[in-house]
Swiss-Prot record:
It comes from Mus musculus (Mouse). Keywords: Cell membrane, Chloride, Chloride channel, Disulfide bond, Glycoprotein, Ion channel, Ion transport, Ligand-gated ion channel, Membrane, Postsynaptic cell membrane, Receptor, Signal, Synapse, Transmembrane, Transmembrane helix, Transport. Expressed in the brain. 4-aminobutanoate binds at R100, T163. Disruption phenotype: Knockout mice are viable, breed normally and are superficially indistinguishable from WT mice. In electrophysiological recordings, knockout mice show a lack of tonic inhibition in dentate granule cells and thalamic relay neurons. Behaviorally, knockout mice are insensitive to the ataxic, sedative, and analgesic effects of the hypnotic drug, gaboxadol. One of its GO terms (cellular component) is GABA-ergic synapse. Heteropentamer, formed by a combination of alpha (GABRA1-6), beta (GABRB1-3), gamma (GABRG1-3), delta (GABRD), epsilon (GABRE), rho (GABRR1-3), pi (GABRP) and theta (GABRQ) chains, each subunit exhibiting distinct physiological and pharmacological properties. Residues 36-259, 306-318, 539-552 are extracellular. Residues 281-284, 342-515 are cytoplasmic. This is Gamma-aminobutyric acid receptor subunit alpha-4. Glycans are attached at N47, N144, N157. It catalyses: chloride(in) = chloride(out). Residues 396-406 have a biased composition (Basic and acidic residues).
Length: 552
């Protein structure tokens, strides 16, 4: 009996010991640290190979995740590393981005010691990836230096992160009506090329506000300021189905500095220069013509150069309107001078015609003419009587002559002749009356002949010199000659006063300032200043930023 009872007790003790041993082993396994596991995994890379091989075993990368079942959701976000430049002529912009896509592929689930499998670009070609393309992209380049810039990660639950670095040149439709005070919303549109929204849709990873990041240092724009960006999504219908399109709008506002220096200030200075001609004398035709032609050619050059930085649009921009108005002011200044010159010439021609017309006849004119004729006849009779008296005086003096030496008489005779000839000639040259000049000349010549006859030889061959040097005859003869000169001068002066018409009035010189110039000096600057005020107030206060909805 005793031996039978001892055997079950020993068996019970051995069972308890075994159970306690198993419990201690299990506790030791549970207390093992993860670091030791990871260390073991590093030491055993064949574990990763085994996991990847198991994932790709029977995997078909031609089929999307959940094929024939639920819709595949692709989450996206964009990080901009460089934005710019923007081309107005080509209407496009360029930027470098990190384009990230995330989706879930349950076929790539795995159970292993590592949370994330960080793989290179070689794995990309072995699994399914979204067929994303940029709808408004003109040229997109994936960087491959020094290796393809792609990132691929697989998580335990089958979530996949696919990132690549791209340089995208996208189209940016621009409405340049308000150029250069304009703003634009340049879109970036992307979506699936083959899968409609019934099979694949796109969403933003971090929501609409934070899914697109553009750091300030990434902007490399010269003519624009990057104000911000907005995101949206839309559905586009086509013959192959409806597709989800994701859109990012980059809002740009143009800088005015370049165009102020290059176009606006030169145009304003050219208009002011054209108005300087209003202050130049209207007789200075070459100077004013040079001002007008030079300013017109300058405005033409400015208008051509301003269009070089723009596409060949069919509508007028804000700068085109400003240049057109400035050109109109410059051209009007040239036309204003042409009008001034034309009306000045007309006034001078009218004044010359008035001067060339004979003065109206006065009723007393015939009476004056008759009086002038009578006066001329009286002067003629007086000159004849005076000539007779002179001849009588010469003959009486020749009878009272004394005998002198022949040499002295000859010299005195020549002196008298020279004086008698010079006196009437000088008087004739200064006398304006033809009647008085003729009568005086005859009288003086007769007196000279009388003196010469006094010295002529006698019939007996002897000379009869006149004694001009006697004291009795010299004063009488001199006084008579003086009276003759006085009478001739008086007669000639009277005839001159009655016969000579008054001198004509000088023609108008046309000097002075034209009334057109006076008005233009005030009208042109005031009008141009008012235009500038309205122009700048309207465009600077106007919201010229394009709305995102207008581009959709």
């Amino acid at each position: 009996m005793v031996s039978v009872q001892k055997v079950p007790a020993i068996a019970l003790c051995s069972g308890v010991s075994l159970a306690l041993l198993h419990f201690l082993c299990l506790a030791a396994c549970l207390n093992e640290s993860p670091g030791q596991n990871s260390k073991d995994e590093k030491l055993c890379p064949e574990n990763f190979t085994r996991i990847l091989d198991s994932l790709l075993d029977g995997y078909d990368n031609r089929l999307r995740p959940g094929f024939g079942g639920p819709v595949t959701e692709v989450k996206t976000d964009i990080y901009v590393t460089s934005f710019g430049p923007v081309s107005d002529v080509e209407m496009e912009y360029t930027m470098d981005v990190f384009f990230r896509q995330t989706w879930i592929d349950k076929r790539l689930k795995y159970d292993g010691p590592i949370e994330i499998l960080r793989l290179n670009n070689m794995m990309v070609t072995k699994v399914w990836t979204p067929d994303t393309f940029f709808r408004n992209g003109k040229k997109s380049v994936s960087h491959n230096m020094t290796a393809p810039n792609k990132l691929f990660r697989i998580m335990r639950n089958g979530t996949i992160l696919y990132t690549m670095r791209l340089t995208i040149s996208a189209e940016c439709p621009m409405r340049l009506v308000d150029f250069p005070m304009d703003g634009h919303a340049c879109p970036l549109k992307f979506g699936s090329y083959a899968y409609p929204k019934s099979e694949m849709i796109y969403t933003w990873t971090k929501g609409p506000e934070k899914s697109v990041e553009v750091p300030k240092e990434s902007s490399s724009l010269v003519q624009y300021d990057l104000i911000g960006q907005t995101v949206s999504s839309e559905t586009i219908k086509s013959i192959t189905g409806e597709y989800i399109v994701m859109t990012v709008y980059f809002h740009l506002r143009r800088k005015m500095g370049y165009f102020m220096i290059q176009t606006y200030i030169p145009c304003i200075m050219t208009v002011i220069l054209s108005q300087v001609s209003f202050w130049i004398n209207k007789e200075s035709v070459p100077a004013r013509t040079v001002f007008g032609i030079t300013t017109v050619l300058t405005m033409t050059t400015l208008s051509i150069s301003a269009r070089h930085s723009l596409p060949k649009v069919s509508y007028a921009t804000a700068m085109d309107w400003f240049i057109a108005v400035c050109f109109a002011f410059v051209f009007s200044a040239l036309i204003e001078f042409a009008a001034v010159n034309y009306f000045t010439n007309i006034q001078m021609q009218k004044a010359k015609k008035k001067i060339s017309k004979p003065p109206p006849e006065v009723p007393a004119a015939p009476v004056l003419k008759e009086k002038h004729t009578e006066t001329s006849l009286q002067n003629t009779h007086a000159n004849l009587n005076m000539r007779k008296r002179t001849n009588a005086l010469v003959h009486s003096e020749s009878d009272v002559k004394s005998r002198t030496e022949v040499g002295n008489h000859s010299s005195k005779t020549s002196a008298v002749q020279e004086s008698s000839e010079a006196t009437p000639k000088a008087h004739l040259a200064s006398s304006p009356n033809p009647f008085s000049r003729a009568n005086a000349a005859e009288t003086m010549s007769a007196a000279a002949r009388g003196l010469s006859s006094a010295a002529s030889p006698s019939p007996h061959g002897t000379l009869r010199p006149a004694s001009l040097g006697s004291a009795s005859t010299r004063p009488a003869f001199g006084s008579r000659l003086g009276r003759i000169k006085t009478t001739v001068n008086t007669t000639g002066a009277a005839g001159n006063v009655s016969a000579t018409p008054p001198p004509p009035a000088p023609p108008p010189s046309g000097s002075g300032t034209s009334k057109i110039d006076k008005y233009a000096r005030i009208l042109f600057p005031v009008t141009f200043g008012a235009f500038n005020m309205v122009y700048w107030v309207v465009y600077l206060s106007k919201d010229t930023m394009e709305k995102s909805e207008s581009l959709m």
